[in-house]
């Protein structure tokens, strides 16, 4: 196990760094992204997107480069940056501005440069026939490419009526979850079905992870603020529609925090897919005042393994015992696993001290606690 701090709070003119993403391209380049936050580091402060690249499987990293700057878009943050690794080597990306505009860009050189952004918000307006969203966000984390070539990423949306951010700012609650997808390599995007609703049984479903199962179905693992304090699971035959009723997974605790989900390239000895899930595996309230949206301490970041299509998670190991929040997972060319995550805290739980990347192998994970 090796841990490296990639972005340190209070450096390079930013207050802190949050919402990390990580991806291994088809050509083996590792890309690590963060929201570089100004102001007080809140969701609505001025955020840029920074990227670091690794050409040796996550051992060493090139200096940060700013790939999206919020001040070129007007007031509001740039956020929820999502990367996709295309089998042809292309890197696709989606991100949001001010939680009401969505943009697409791409890289053909492993993230060394990106195309000019193209706004795709118009495609997402189709959701308004069912839900009058005023706030919308992609991911975060990474999107996926299905074996048939389709690009899929979950999105969450809100009517903005929540008051949690104060006067003049749209709320992120109540919220709903859907997917968007592209069948032409990111050129155009389509709306999937809205499949997780704030309906009283489920409370404020939001940041969602997608993975392709052994038989080609797509599973979504959903954050929510439901009192069951468990992750929600829904499955679709194609990542777009016919979603199953979301059900709580008793094995996966929900402290109200984004998680991460990854299918490894190589199956196990029986030919079954190997899946990893990471999130703060904790329901204590030593660091977080109880009662706020049922949130619990973001600590004890753990990685779990499944070999039966995410049905059970018999293997689990703590990666970071202390404060640790949002994360994302990738697999390096040599099979090493990379987990990028929010590490440590300063003034409050969401004032992240650093964004770090941990590098480990299956043997470390299988060894357990």
Which positions does each model-derived feature cover?
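Asp-box/BNR beta-propeller blade signature and adjacent active/binding-site loops
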Residues: 1-369
């Amino acid at each position: 196990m090796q841990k490296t701090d990639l972005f340190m709070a209070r450096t390079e003119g930013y207050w802190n760094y949050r919402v990390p993403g990580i991806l291994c391209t088809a050509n083996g380049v590792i890309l690590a992204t963060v929201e570089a936050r100004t102001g007080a580091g809140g969701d609505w402060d001025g955020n840029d997107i920074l990227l670091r690249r690794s050409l040796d499987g996550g051992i060493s990293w090139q200096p940060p480069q700013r790939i999206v700057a919020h001040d070129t878009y007007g007031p509001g943050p740039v956020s929820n940056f999502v990367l996709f690794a295309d089998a042809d080597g292309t890197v696709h990306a989606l991100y949001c501005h001010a939680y009401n505009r969505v943009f697409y860009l791409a890289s053909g050189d492993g993230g060394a440069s990106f195309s000019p952004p193209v706004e795709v918000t118009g495609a997402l307006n189709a959701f308004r026939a069912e839900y009058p969203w005023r706030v919308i966000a992609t991911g975060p984390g990474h999107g996926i490419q299905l074996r048939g070539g389709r690009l899929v990423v979950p999105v969450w949306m809100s009517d903005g009526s929540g008051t949690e951010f104060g006067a003049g700012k749209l709320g992120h609650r109540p919220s709903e979850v859907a997917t968007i997808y592209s069948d032409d390599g990111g050129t155009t995007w389509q709306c999937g079905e809205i499949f997780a609703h704030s309906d009283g049984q489920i409370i404020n479903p939001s940041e969602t992870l997608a993975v392709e199962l052994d038989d080609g179905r797509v599973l979504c693992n959903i954050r929510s603020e439901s009192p069951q304090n468990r992750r929600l699971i829904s499955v679709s035959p194609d990542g777009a529609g016919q979603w199953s009723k979301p059900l709580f997974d008793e094995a996966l605790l929900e402290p109200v925090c984004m998680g991460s989900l990854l299918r490894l390239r190589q199956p196990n000895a029986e030919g079954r897919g190997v899946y990893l899930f990471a999130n703060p595996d904790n329901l204590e309230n030593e660091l977080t005042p109880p009662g706020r949206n049922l949130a619990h301490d973001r600590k004890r970041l753990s990685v779990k393994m499944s070999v039966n299509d995410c049905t059970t998670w018999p293997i689990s190991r703590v990666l970071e015992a202390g404060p640790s929040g949002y994360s994302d997972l990738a697999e390096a060319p040599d099979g090493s696993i990379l987990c990028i995550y929010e590490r440590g805290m300063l003034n409050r739980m969401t004032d992240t001290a650093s964004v770090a990347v941990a590098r480990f192998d299956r043997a470390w994970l299988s060894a357990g606690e």
